């Protein structure tokens, strides 16, 4: 049983902890927090051992017991998943090295924070036995999952993606915009293209980014020039076969991210989370060698199964990407609980204790 420490219990950390808890080969060693805020209270209520990142006194004053400091958590963990805010993970890197504990960082860190940038579908094997890995950002994760099967089946000559990004997560009260549409950045490419190239170094990709006043999901407008000319139906079947790609049937009447999140909440997903890329099936179009589609990415959730797979890769628990992905998906419920593209319902009870 792998003992996994979670340093940080915010948007990503709490989801990773719950995902680790339901894995058959993992257990949560504990979670580290800087302050005894509501997230620390939730962690305690869920039965996770709390560790103090910046001293135990504030937790004692808040009557929240701690099992030790972050150093103690790292020492007791086989692998640590660092889900602290951007920049903090890089500052923590020396802690993990000091304790000789493999560590997984998030996509907000620069690529050089880790030995490898990681996406389970695209380059799992490169992280097997590594000391550190960086799970790429939510947008890069979504693009990598989409591009990997396209590259394998048809070859990719060039990718062009416009990313319409949510202004903030629901809990980020200090971010925006509130009433504007921003090119972000104005320069081309946005950082997303170079980040995808940390997964596919030889990929020709251009990306443009925008921010809009919503907290729902990111939406991508994708154009991929392939090296061959498959039929639209062939590409649709290829993508439908990927467990972490959900093709939204036209019959559901889901025309935006708001309805998509409403659907996943009603379907019983914990927190309404969408671990999969959500591709509008009717948007998939092939003209010559050019593929077009729209997809939505849930920025709070899509990297969660990737973190679980990264734990297995670093710990060398399995060298097989397919085996790890299947185990993660089965335990978490990825690829299930929603209506499949052929219209047949596939529902399972949620394993998460949310």
Swiss-Prot record:
Catalytic center at which residues? 138
This protein's pathway reads:
Carbohydrate degradation; glycolysis; pyruvate from D-glyceraldehyde 3-phosphate: step 1/5
Gene3D superfamilies named among the record's database cross-references: Dihydrodipicolinate Reductase, domain 2 (3.30.360.10), NAD(P)-binding Rossmann-like Domain (3.40.50.720)
Q: Name one GO biological process term.
A: glycolytic process
Residues noted as binding NAD(+) in the record, renumbered to the chain = 11-12, 108, 166, 299
Q: Which residues form a coiled coil?
A: none
| CC annotations in GO | cytoplasm
**Oligomer status and interactors:** Homotetramer.
Please give the name of this protein.
Glyceraldehyde-3-phosphate dehydrogenase
Q: What is the lineage of its organism?
A: Archaea, Methanobacteriati, Methanobacteriota, Stenosarchaea group, Halobacteria
Name of the gene this protein is made from: gap
């Amino acid at each position: 049983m792998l003992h996994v420490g979670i340093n940080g219990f915010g948007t990503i950390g709490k989801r990773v902890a719950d995902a680790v808890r339901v894995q058959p080969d993992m257990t949560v060693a504990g979670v580290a927090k800087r302050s005894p805020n509501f997230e620390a209270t939730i962690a305690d209520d869920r039965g996770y051992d709390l560790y103090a990142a910046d001293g135990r006194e504030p937790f004692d004053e808040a009557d929240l017991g701690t099992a030790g400091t972050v150093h103690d958590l790292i020492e007791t963990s086989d692998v640590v998943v660092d889900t602290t805010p951007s920049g903090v993970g890089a500052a923590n890197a020396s802690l993990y090295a000091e304790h000789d504990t493999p560590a997984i960082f998030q996509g907000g860190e620069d690529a050089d924070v880790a030995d490898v940038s990681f996406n389970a579908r695209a380059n799992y094997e490169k992280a097997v036995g590594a000391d550190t890995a960086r799970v790429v950002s939510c947008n890069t994760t979504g693009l990598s999952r989409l591009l990997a099967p396209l590259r394998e089946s048809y070859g990719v000559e060039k990718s062009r993606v416009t990313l319409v990004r949510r202004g903030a997560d629901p809990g980020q009260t200090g971010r925006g915009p509130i009433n504007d549409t921003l090119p972000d950045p104005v320069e081309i490419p946005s950082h997303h293209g170079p980040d995808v190239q940390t997964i596919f170094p030889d990929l020709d990709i251009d990306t443009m980014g925008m921010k809009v006043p919503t907290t729902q999901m990111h939406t991508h407008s994708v154009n991929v020039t392939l090296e061959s000319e498959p039929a639209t139906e062939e590409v649709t079947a290829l993508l439908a076969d990927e467990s972490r790609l959900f093709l939204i049937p036209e019959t559901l009447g889901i025309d935006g991210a708001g309805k998509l999140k409403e659907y996943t909440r009603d379907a019983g997903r914990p927190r309404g989370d969408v671990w999969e890329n959500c591709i509008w099936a009717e948007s998939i179009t092939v003209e010559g060698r050019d593929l077009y589609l729209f997809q939505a990415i849930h920025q709070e959730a899509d990297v969660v199964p990737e973190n679980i797979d990264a734990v297995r890769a670093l710990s060398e628990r399995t060298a097989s990407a397919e085996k790890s992905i299947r185990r993660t998906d089965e335990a978490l419920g990825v690829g299930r609980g929603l209506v499949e593209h052929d219209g047949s319902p596939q529902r399972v009870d949620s394993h998460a204790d949310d």
